[in-house]
Amino acid sequence: MQAATLSFQPSAPPLQTSAFHFSSKQPNQLKYSLFSYTCPILKRSLLSTQTLSRKSICKPPDVATGKYVREDYLVKKVSAKDIQELIKGERNVPLIIDFYATWCGPCILMAQELEMLAVEYESNALIVKVDTDDEYEFARDMQVRGLPTLYFISPDPNKDAIRTEGLIPIQMMRDIINNDL
């Protein structure tokens, strides 16, 4: 009996899956792909125009953090004490509480959508946010496990609050505000 031998010859070179790779001809030289390079002159000019426009709409940097802070955000950052007063007090509009962190990517995306909702529902809903790094005990008491977490609280004290966790579409937030609160 003869044994059959199979050999495989790839027809195309292997795909490059990384932003950089090592050259087999020169093992110590690192080659960059087209997508990983940004012209330093272009990068510097883009940063300077972005920085100038940001500085023109922001107040001077906060002494503690050194960051520029916009003053015209509709969604205001509040403390745990402020939230407790808002919940206990009488409201004519629903209250939406966003538990977020500054380092959380989905929280940043959600903040943009909440700003759009705040413009859309300016007089029909109150939207506030709580930084879980600053108010970690309050976040723990509110059972915030994942970020971002939203609480939708109806002005009617007989209705249960609605809790969502994770990034949700803006249309879902509209539906909750319009139909469930």
From Swiss-Prot:
<keyword id="KW-0676">Redox-active center</keyword>
<feature type="disulfide bond" description="Redox-active">
    <location>
        <begin position="104"/>
        <end position="107"/>
    </location>
</feature>
<feature type="domain" description="Thioredoxin">
    <location>
        <begin position="72"/>
        <end position="181"/>
    </location>
</feature>
<keyword id="KW-1015">Disulfide bond</keyword>
<dbReference type="InterPro" id="IPR036249">
    <property type="entry name" value="Thioredoxin-like_sf"/>
</dbReference>
<dbReference type="GO" id="GO:0045454">
    <property type="term" value="P:cell redox homeostasis"/>
</dbReference>
<comment type="function">
    <text>Probable thiol-disulfide oxidoreductase that may play a role in proper chloroplast development.</text>
</comment>
<keyword id="KW-0560">Oxidoreductase</keyword>
<keyword id="KW-0934">Plastid</keyword>
<feature type="site" description="Contributes to redox potential value">
    <location>
        <position position="106"/>
    </location>
</feature>
<dbReference type="GO" id="GO:0009579">
    <property type="term" value="C:thylakoid"/>
</dbReference>
<keyword id="KW-0813">Transport</keyword>
<keyword id="KW-0809">Transit peptide</keyword>
<keyword id="KW-0150">Chloroplast</keyword>
<dbReference type="InterPro" id="IPR013766">
    <property type="entry name" value="Thioredoxin_domain"/>
</dbReference>
<feature type="site" description="Contributes to redox potential value">
    <location>
        <position position="105"/>
    </location>
</feature>
<dbReference type="Pfam" id="PF00085">
    <property type="entry name" value="Thioredoxin"/>
</dbReference>
<dbReference type="GO" id="GO:0009657">
    <property type="term" value="P:plastid organization"/>
</dbReference>
<dbReference type="GO" id="GO:0015035">
    <property type="term" value="F:protein-disulfide reductase activity"/>
</dbReference>
<feature type="active site" description="Nucleophile">
    <location>
        <position position="107"/>
    </location>
</feature>
<keyword id="KW-0249">Electron transport</keyword>
<feature type="transit peptide" description="Chloroplast">
    <location>
        <begin position="1"/>
        <end position="70"/>
    </location>
</feature>
<dbReference type="InterPro" id="IPR044182">
    <property type="entry name" value="CITRX"/>
</dbReference>
<feature type="site" description="Deprotonates C-terminal active site Cys">
    <location>
        <position position="98"/>
    </location>
</feature>
<dbReference type="GO" id="GO:0009507">
    <property type="term" value="C:chloroplast"/>
</dbReference>
<comment type="similarity">
    <text>Belongs to the thioredoxin family. Plant CITRX-type subfamily.</text>
</comment>
<feature type="active site" description="Nucleophile">
    <location>
        <position position="104"/>
    </location>
</feature>
<protein>
    <recommendedName>
        <fullName>Thioredoxin-like protein CITRX2, chloroplastic</fullName>
        <ecNumber>1.8.-.-</ecNumber>
    </recommendedName>
</protein>
